[in-house]
Amino acid sequence: GLHMGLLSAVVFGAARLILALHPVSATGWPSRSIAAAAALIAATGYLALSGGNVATERAYIMCAVALCALMIGRRAISLRAVAVAGIIVLTLRPEALMGPGFQMSFAATTALVAVFGWMRDFEGEVIPKRLRPVAAIVISSAVAGFATAPISAAHFNTVAHYGLVANLLSVPLMGVLVIPAAVLAAILAPIGG
């Protein structure tokens, strides 16, 4: 889920940047919708390349719902989008409801959307602007860890003791180095020999 989300975000941002470079596309075209469509195509390609296992399908559906919401001018990250993704996943695979993967991914996503929605709507600046990227990683890791801990304990009789620390180290690395390098490699692959 994280990889697909990061890939979609990188492609969305790159497409918006490319469209902003020319005055016609910057002002006359629906650049947000076009960028969301490009990100959806990239996510679809990632789904095809990854083999389309259940976890990747679930991440793709959640990502596709968010990107389609952007294409039609709606808020991409909302509890409604999470609910729509859940309905689609359960329609395609009803047995997923009892699996730890479904429960943990939707618990984490619901908690993250709720917490960041509350923070977005909160009046005033609690966190200084320059610290927000770091705070977002810490908050995301903590919220996801707390949301999934009871489910992990119920299914596996254990909780991840070092999950917060591991995420604090791996998420920035994935977002800044690995995913952009993978996108660049995929774009340049037809050119190379």
Task: State each model region's role.
Residues 158-166, 184-193:
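Membrane-interfacial interhelical loops
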Residues 1-164, 181:
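Hydrophobic alpha-helical transmembrane segments in multi-pass membrane proteins
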